[in-house]
Amino acid sequence: MNIHVTLVRQPVSYLLALLVAVSLSACGFHLRGSEALPPEMAVTYIQSGNPFSTLVDDFAAALRARGAKVTERLEDATAVLRIQENDTERDVLSVNTSGKVLEYELRQTIQFAVATAENLPIVESQTVSMSRAYLYKSTDVLGSEREKDAVRRTLQKSLVNMAMLRIGSTTR
């Protein structure tokens, strides 16, 4: 009897999984990173004031995840992603009764544009900005620095994803 129940459940579970997959694709659902890029961005060069920054690395990873090839030579590129601005600020959000900082807010703003190798605009200059708060413990400075770095990394990755969504929206 257990064998019969297992055999019946297995095809039903496959059928259910297939039904869910078809439903999601029919409604236009896409996994993150699967947003299509403009065809001109097949081979992209990333231009930045600091070519060794983690922001450039994050953009390169996001482009590769979407099927683009990232080149280090401008001559080989079919498109150029220009990082025009990358500003990070830190503000005090709250203090205790002694005047010691309890919470900070990190804010990052990036400005970018995409053009063809012939300098024809694909995506006009756009700005994306985001902020995140984190707790600061004066008794655990190393832990607080690690938390600040982790918040900064997730903030930057979120900004890159927002920028990629904007770039991908030009293909529609």
What spans do the regions from the language model cover?
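Bacterial N-terminal signal peptides that target proteins for export
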Residues: 3-16
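N-terminal segment of the mature soluble domain
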Residues: 42-87
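Bacterial signal peptide processing site
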Residues: 28-31
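C-terminal motif of bacterial Sec signal peptides marking the signal peptidase cleavage site
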Residues: 22-26
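Acidic/histidine-rich, surface-exposed loop or edge segments in extracytoplasmic proteins
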Residues: 40-47, 140-144
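Sec/Tat-exported extracytoplasmic proteins
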Residues: 63, 67, 114-118, 138, ...
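Surface-exposed short loop/turn segments
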Residues: 76, 82-127, 131-146
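C-terminal/domain-edge helix-coil "capping" segments
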Residues: 142-172
